[in-house]
Amino acid sequence: MRTEWIAKRSGHKNVSQMHYGRQGIITEEMNFVAQRENLPAELIRAEVARGRMIIPANINHTNLEPMCIGIASRCKVNANIGASPNTSDITKEVDKLKLSIKYGADTVMDLSTGGGNLDEIRTAIINASPVPIGTVPVYQAVESVHGRIENLTADDFLHVIEKHAQQGVDYQTIHAGILIEHLPLVRSRITGIVSRGGGIIAKWMLHHHKQNPLYTHFDDIIEIFKKYDVSFSLGDSLRPGCTHDASDEAQLAELKTLGQLTRRAWGHEVQVMVEGPGHVPMDQIEFNVKKQMEECSSPPLNALDLDPLASNANEQMEKFNVLGPAPFYVLGPLVTDIAPGYDHITSAIGAAMAGWYGTAMLCYVTPKEHLGLPNAEDVRNGLIAYKIAAHAADIGRHRQGARDRDDELSAARYNFDWNRQFELSLDPERAKEYHDETLPADIYKTAEFCSMCGPKFCPMQTKVDADALTELEKFLAKEKEVVTQS
């Protein structure tokens, strides 16, 4: 689909959507996104130009169906897949991709660390994927030196980053925000550093006593991303791994650096989103979203004494010609740490709140989080939990049309249209399965009850006649008149 679109850009030094957006050009990708989101194409262009929205669309991912991530659009959900050294292969990973898309993933990240040839796995995933694919290049960098992190050089990192870009990866998590001076700040934490990529960079810095090479070579990464229109997903290496560690000095120090890197990328017209925590108590979620918005804008919003969550925030930001804030992309956050096996629930609670406050994309968490590699059923449960969270956030933010499907399903429920209820469900197969568990015969698909209330006690059988309501209103009016006169 995109081959002809991309051919027109041949020879351009910067092919990013942000670059074209700032020139006033509405790209084919922007038009496609506008139709998907039911938003004006000019709004999409303006949001991308300001850095408030990204369209992750590598020029080498030609079978991509473009989508957007930003506060002006629907809240999105990412699913993680990937082979490990002990399990999985190419076929299994492509199957996981298809399953993720089936259950509503808007983007998919390939987090493979082993299980075969990583380049072949990634290529197969990209070739099979109509949704954007993200990666964490430091994983393959470590694999290339057989796990000897101390042997990695800046060139090793850059080589892998460019390879991923050439293959068609749409966004890459770059752990450039963790600095050597941040490392002592984790001393008081219970869980230390829980980001795999962040842990790799931390070990490298501790061994060499040198600054993070992804930070010192950030401009080189920008040049790579310009050529292929790869979006930055700035990794939060110091995200909290438990509620005790949330919003601490280490996390906020890195966030400030991520804001600086965001502005540097924008200076070269490269797209950016910023990753966030993690494990956060409910009372700190609003603070975390607000803090990211403040830091990852140009200029930083706290310098303007501007509240990004105020009802007139967008109007004020336009008044001061503010760029951003960059889209926020959070993992969860989990609001409690005591429910292993149920962390798709503990995190979906936090995800719904984060989305309501303005987070643009939610990274799903499966029931296997902290316990093991998820299987197909775990992926399904995690994705549905997060589709619920994202949809609830859209309703809470009063996005245009967000509640239409809810209203349609409610009408079908009231009319006992069981098949229509199943069709409108986020997981039609599960809804039908639960209904048919006790009432499997086809005749019950038109029955005016389910097995909860049975045929005699369902309150929705009480259909209030319009004429009866009119008569009742007349009666109540007369009663009120009598009371008034007395």
Curated annotation (Swiss-Prot):
Any one of the GO CC terms: cytosol
Annotated residues for binding of substrate: 80, 109, 139, 175, 195-197, 236-239, 275, 329
Keywords, ordered alphabetically: 4Fe-4S, Iron, Iron-sulfur, Lyase, Metal-binding, S-adenosyl-L-methionine, Thiamine biosynthesis, Zinc
Catalysed reactions, as listed in the record: 5-amino-1-(5-phospho-beta-D-ribosyl)imidazole + S-adenosyl-L-methionine = 4-amino-2-methyl-5-(phosphooxymethyl)pyrimidine + CO + 5'-deoxyadenosine + formate + L-methionine + 3 H(+)
Amino-acid positions noted as binding [4Fe-4S] cluster in the UniProt annotation, renumbered to this chain: 450, 453, 458
CC cofactor: [4Fe-4S] cluster
MF-aspect GO terms: 4 iron, 4 sulfur cluster binding; carbon-carbon lyase activity; zinc ion binding
Cofactor, how bound (note): Binds 1 [4Fe-4S] cluster per subunit. The cluster is coordinated with 3 cysteines and an exchangeable S-adenosyl-L-methionine.
Enzyme Commission no: 4.1.99.17
Keyword Electron transport: no
Pfam families according to UniProt: ThiC_Rad_SAM (PF01964)
Pathway: Cofactor biosynthesis; thiamine diphosphate biosynthesis
Positions bound to Zn(2+): 279, 370
Enzyme class: lyase
Superkingdom assignment: Bacteria
HAMAP family: ThiC
Biological role stated in the UniProt entry: Catalyzes the synthesis of the hydroxymethylpyrimidine phosphate (HMP-P) moiety of thiamine from aminoimidazole ribotide (AIR) in a radical S-adenosyl-L-methionine (SAM)-dependent reaction.
Stated name of the protein: Phosphomethylpyrimidine synthase
Species, as recorded: Trichodesmium erythraeum (strain IMS101)
Phylogenetic classification of the source organism: Bacteria, Bacillati, Cyanobacteriota, Cyanophyceae, Oscillatoriophycideae
